[in-house]
């Protein structure tokens, strides 16, 4: 294993301190328990948006703390859920009279710990559960996983909260975005968790994992490597079958890198995916390409499609000022 590490034990702490210093105009770090929050408090009465999860997916979630998105993020250890104490401390620090909305990816540890924090809070709160991974059917035992679509929920709901939407409206909007968003990923290689020191799974030089999870979970199937067009058609076909978009439907296309795939290849994937849906009459009117929901050093990417209406377009276009997303301000 070759990584820039002093010791595994202090990796997260050093990384978070560096992140907070590098973006000191936007965020601040609470050392114990760990959470990242805005440096400038939100307006009184604003709904506080909080998310979090295991580290190793940067810039998710800390990179999305700031005006127009999250009020705080709770980073756990690598691929490990943050604790209820982190979530409770973050909520108490940023709640400002409008209640708290937790945005939670659908993983058992995250769901359980956010539920505990929710029960401990003494202010109005609600939860949006993100489950955009269509690698498995909705009837899967634990439900679908939350993956790259999470940032789309955070951006759109964050804009509405910034504009003064109340807790019920923010919760309803988050659920709406989740229902019209679908993602699926492919891995060309595994990732290496620092504490483990070796790849999380073995994969042959001529194999790819279709439907891989962002923690290296096994996907839908393992197949022989094939052309980029064939890979995109496979992923986009499953997403299309799930969402069943209508001709002329407006949509956001998000190509997300897992950490070790060059932008040259991510833009190639965007070109192929956009052609897939343009041929079917979809109006790809918004886009996002880059490494936003990563899996440490995994080579691969995911495709996310979100169906849009005028309301969702307005909130997506609204100003945002975070470490990882910034426009209109």
Where are the regions a protein language model picked out?
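N-terminal amphipathic/basic leader segments beginning at the initiator methionine
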Residues: 1-49, 310-329
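Gly-rich Lys/Arg/Thr-decorated short loops/hinges at beta-loop-alpha junctions or inter-strand turns
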Residues: 44-52, 61-74, 135-136, 208-224
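Glycine-rich oxoanion-binding loops at beta->alpha junctions
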Residues: 57, 64-66, 70-96, 240
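Short, acidic/small-residue loops that bind anionic groups at enzyme active sites
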Residues: 73-78, 121-143, 279-284
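Short Gly/Thr/Asp-enriched flexible loops that form oxyanion-binding sites at enzyme active sites
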Residues: 111-124, 130, 265-271
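Short alpha-helices
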Residues: 128-180
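Mixed-charge interfacial surface used for oligomerization/domain docking
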Residues: 163-268
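C-terminal non-catalytic interaction/assembly regions of soluble proteins
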Residues: 238-329
């Amino acid at each position: 294993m070759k990584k820039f590490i002093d010791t595994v034990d202090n990796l997260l702490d050093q990384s978070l301190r560096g992140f907070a210093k590098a973006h000191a105009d936007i965020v601040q770090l609470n050392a114990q328990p760990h959470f990242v929050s805005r440096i400038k408090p939100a307006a009184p009465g604003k709904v506080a948006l909080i998310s979090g999860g295991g580290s190793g997916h940067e810039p998710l979630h800390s990179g999305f703390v700031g005006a127009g998105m999250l009020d705080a993020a709770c980073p756990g250890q690598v691929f490990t859920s943050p604790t209820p104490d982190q979530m409770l401390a973050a909520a108490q620090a940023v709640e400002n009279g409008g209640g708290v909305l937790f945005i939670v990816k659908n993983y058992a540890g995250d769901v359980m710990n956010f539920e505990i924090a929710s029960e401990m809070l003494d202010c109005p709160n609600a939860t949006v559960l993100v489950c955009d991974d269509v690698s498995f059917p909705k009837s899967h035992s634990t439900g679908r996983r939350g993956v790259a679509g999470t940032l789309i929920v955070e951006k759109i709901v964050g804009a509405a909260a910034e504009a003064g939407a109340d807790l019920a409206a923010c919760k309803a909007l988050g659920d709406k975005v989740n229902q019209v968003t679908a993602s699926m990923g492919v891995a060309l290689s595994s990732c290496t968790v620092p504490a483990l020191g070796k790849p999380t799974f073995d994969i042959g030089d001529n194999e790819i994992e279709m439907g891989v999870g962002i923690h290296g979970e096994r996907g839908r199937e393992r197949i022989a490597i094939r052309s980029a067009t064939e890979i995109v058609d496979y992923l986009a076909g499953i997403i299309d079958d799930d969402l069943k978009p209508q001709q002329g439907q407006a949509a956001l296309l998000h190509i997300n890198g897992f950490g070790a795939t060059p932008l040259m290849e991510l833009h190639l994937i965007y070109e192929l995916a956009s052609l897939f849906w343009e041929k079917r009459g979809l109006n790809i009117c918004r886009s996002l390409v880059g490494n936003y929901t990563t899996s440490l050093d995994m080579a691969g990417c995911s495709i996310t499609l979100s169906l849009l209406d005028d309301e969702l377009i307005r909130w997506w276009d609204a100003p945002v000022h975070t470490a990882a997303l910034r426009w209109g301000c």
